[in-house]
Every structure is written in C-alpha cells, then in structure tokens.
Regions:
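Signature of lipid phosphatidyltransferase scaffolds
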Residues: 1-68
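Polyanion-binding interface signature
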Residues: 44-191
Length: 193
C-alpha cells in the first residue's frame, strides 16, 4: 500500500511538473461588496498581456514591528494603510480595520499620464477583482476606490489576511498591542514592500 504512493500516477517531484498552476490563498474580503465585481481568470490573463498606458508603484508607508507604538507622526502608525489606528471619526465607534488612505508620492503624481483629480477609472486586480477608483486631494495624491473607503483596504489587507500574515481586527481601539497594524515585516513576508 505504501509503495503505491510512489507510483508516477500518484505523485512526482514538483520540479518535473510544468502544467500545474500554483494556487495562492483566496482573498475573500471583497466578496459580496456592492461596488466590486469578480473578473474571470481569462480576462485577468488578457489584461496582463496588454501594455498599460501608464503604470506606477504605490509605496506603502508602514512602521517596523517594534515601532507600532511610536505615534510621533514619523512612523506611519496612524496613516496610509494603518489609518484605522488614527483617532475615531466618532467617539462612539472605532475606525474600521479595512479603512485605508493611500497617499501617492510626488514622484508618482507628477508622472505624465497619472490620473486627474476626481476623474474615475477602473482598477482590475491580479487576483480577479474590478472596481472604480479615483484620485482626490491636493495634487491628486489620495488614491482610493469610488463610493466605499474600505474597498482598497479590503483588497490590500485582505490579501495579507488570506496569506495568514495578519488577522483582521474587529475594534482597533481595543487592539492595544496593535497586532492588526501592518508592518514592514508583514509586507516583506508577503513578498512586497
């Protein structure tokens, strides 16, 4: 019985396999969100082969793990992807853990082809989601989804949660150890900074 596991029809060295797709964890944080649509894999493959008119890298500004409690304004503990740890908008309710405010650097928003302020465009993610986004604020430096400030966070943080790197937090005011705060180490573990 044990010897049958070595049979070629049952297993092989992964280096010998060429047509087996690698499957990563599925981010389900955007499932059922009204302003988000699932995109079939064939469409994702098509769009990935198309040349983009303009592309840019959004640097996520996050603290190191040992800087999670340094609220001096220099360590990004309450801004960008971690804005959920900033002061609540209401005394009765903490900010949602998925709330993010992606601030784009001047090196990006000065690029030719960077989107104009408040002119919506569509984002198609590599993991199969489609939603409308826009830029706002001075110099178009805020990059966010249209109509729901949690969509971008559900996409970014949802991927980290699906990979088992962080657990979503129900109440950021009660997360006194800030274990739900996204850190440089988490991004490095995921494979992107």
């Amino acid at each position: 019985h044990i010897e049958s596991l070595k049979a070629p029809n049952c297993s092989d060295n992964i280096n010998n396999l060429t047509s087996v797709p690698l499957i990563r964890e599925k981010n389900t944080a955007l499932n059922g969100v009204e302003l988000v649509t699932s995109v079939p894999k064939a469409n994702i493959d098509f769009y990935s082969r198309c040349q983009a008119y303009v592309s840019f890298f959004l640097k996520l500004k996050v603290p190191k793990a040992d800087e999670r409690h340094l609220d001096d304004g220099k360590h990004f503990t309450k801004s960008n992807i971690n804005v959920c740890y900033a002061a609540p908008r209401s005394k009765r309710k903490a900010r949602d853990w998925y709330e993010t405010q992606l601030t784009v650097g001047a090196d990006v928003y000065h690029k030719e082809g960077y989107h104009e302020k408040n002119k919506p465009f569509f984002v198609i993610t590599d993991d199969g989601y489609w939603f409308k986004a826009h830029t706002t604020s001075d110099n178009n430096k805020q990059f966010s989804a249209v109509g729901d400030e949690l969509i971008m966070g559900r996409w970014l943080k949802g991927r980290l949660a699906a990979a088992g790197i962080v657990n979503p937090v129900n109440n950021t005011l009660e997360d006194t150890d800030r274990l739900g705060m996204i850190t440089q180490e988490m991004l490095e573990e995921y494979g992107c900074d």
